Amino acid sequence: MKRTYQPSKTKRVRRFGFRALMKTKGGRAVLSRRRAKGRRKLSASDEKKPF
């Protein structure tokens, strides 16, 4: 039986990247919660950037 998680950077960024989250009301809510909490990574797009 195949495992359920088959990682792909492209799919991850397209689904959970910053621009994808900004498109929906719920996604913007996610970003605002993560900002309020003080997360260094707001979305999957932030994983590419060195800090």
UniProtKB/Swiss-Prot annotation:
The lineage of its organism: Bacteria, Pseudomonadati, Spirochaetota, Spirochaetia, Spirochaetales. One of its GO terms (biological process) is translation. HAMAP family: Ribosomal_bL34. This is Large ribosomal subunit protein bL34. It comes from the Bacteria. The keyword Hydrolase does not apply. Keywords: Ribonucleoprotein, Ribosomal protein. One of its GO terms (cellular component) is ribonucleoprotein complex. Residues 25-51 are annotated as: Disordered. It holds the Pfam family Ribosomal_L34. The gene is rpmH. Residues 31-42 have a biased composition (Basic residues). GO terms for molecular function: structural constituent of ribosome. The keyword Methyltransferase does not apply.
